[in-house]
């Protein structure tokens, strides 16, 4: 009912996130991450009854076939166009090709699915004044993370403390491996460089 009312009031459609990259301010996953098919089907049926609007889905495609089959069922049930975010993943660089092929096949079967490609890669800001940095899962960092930035800098300049950051084992954190991919971490620069060359990475410079 909420979706139907929203579209009648002028909304373009219904968008849902199925990616771990979207979180609440507190860092928790969005409730839509593991939404059941029954819930999504109810929404697709509501959109179908209105006969207007789009569906948008942002997915990690961790189980590509299962996910694509689900999305095709949703698109078919809604009878409306669906847009799916398509991007290249570091761990599976060819997955986007498979996704586009699956979209083409689904459309041959009668669906109306469009791959939506980002104009540039999605990045994540890392720093000592924000929530993510390469040492966030290290015990040494957790000792100072609640201090003011000025106080943190004092510790970061201390050689003994820096050694701890570089040598202590990292604890558990969902983003731990991602924020330590040194060959894919780059200084932002001033002005910002959004398409950095490989030789400007932290790994290359070190």
Regions found by a protein language model. Give the residues of each.
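Active-site neighborhoods of metal-dependent hydrolases
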Residues: 1-46, 57-206
